[in-house]
């Protein structure tokens, strides 16, 4: 090996640089192998073997950093390249036009910008990831604003619901109180303990009408007494076989006195009274010695009938009912004595 020759070599992948300096055969200085001196150069900073151990990667990394690191690791041992503002502006404008990168478009952009197609593809990929992140952020902000608005509306509706519920409860209580008060006032109006009965109420009557009212009251009482007596006479003694109704009048004539009684819709108190329906016991004719029919011409009909005194007595005896009615009224009208008579329907 010639003296003063400097040899620089790289032995193997990742072996580092080797510097060999030959100082000649008679040169001074200690060394190995006749004054030969070996000097090992420094290893490269970004070596493949020590790259993973010497460089510490942060725990949280963005997709852009990962892609750039992967891309530039492939470019070793070349230097990491930065894009100029003009290149970034052109790429941004192209991304706004179309966010998807076709192969022809990628090659054209790389030629215009003086970059490799791989660099253009990585930039578009990173830019698309950032765009999606921004889009998600905008969507989240919009949805959050909508949620806040709906939450506020929900709270307002709940407050209105509580307010309306309280109003309904108060109105219901007032209505119940009003109904209770109305029922109490109605009951008090119907039954007032301090008011007198209707029979005890006295009506003020003028003095001029008092005699007429007294006479009417006396006549009414007398009529009631006569009606009671007539009912006693009409009763058969069996305790209720004779029925008296208010639909018709049974007139008993004794002189000038007339008694109003009722019996039309029920059976006659005589047994077998259906046979003698519409028969009348009229004034007795003393000359003929019998009882005339109610018809003026004296001719009997199928419905009406005429009985004589003896026959009438036999009729009453056969049915088991004996009714004795005597009336001694001495009053005479037109010189003739008027006997008592009965009439029924």
UniProtKB/Swiss-Prot annotation:
Residues 220-241 are annotated as: Disordered. Expressed in seedlings, stems, leaf sheaths and blades and panicles. InterPro entries: HD, HDZip_class_I_plant, Homeobox_CS, Homeodomain-like_sf, HTH_motif, Leu_zip_homeo. Keywords: DNA-binding, Homeobox, Nucleus, Transcription, Transcription regulation. It is found in: Nucleus. GO terms for molecular function: DNA-binding transcription factor activity, RNA polymerase II-specific; sequence-specific DNA binding. Residues 76-135 bind DNA. The keyword Cytoplasm does not apply. GO terms for biological process: positive regulation of DNA-templated transcription. Residues 134-178 are annotated as: Leucine-zipper. One of its GO terms (cellular component) is nucleus. It comes from the Eukaryota. Its main location: nucleus. PANTHER family: HOMEOBOX-LEUCINE ZIPPER PROTEIN, HOMEOBOX-LEUCINE ZIPPER PROTEIN HAT5. Probable transcription factor. Belongs to the HD-ZIP homeobox family. Class I subfamily. This is Homeobox-leucine zipper protein HOX16.
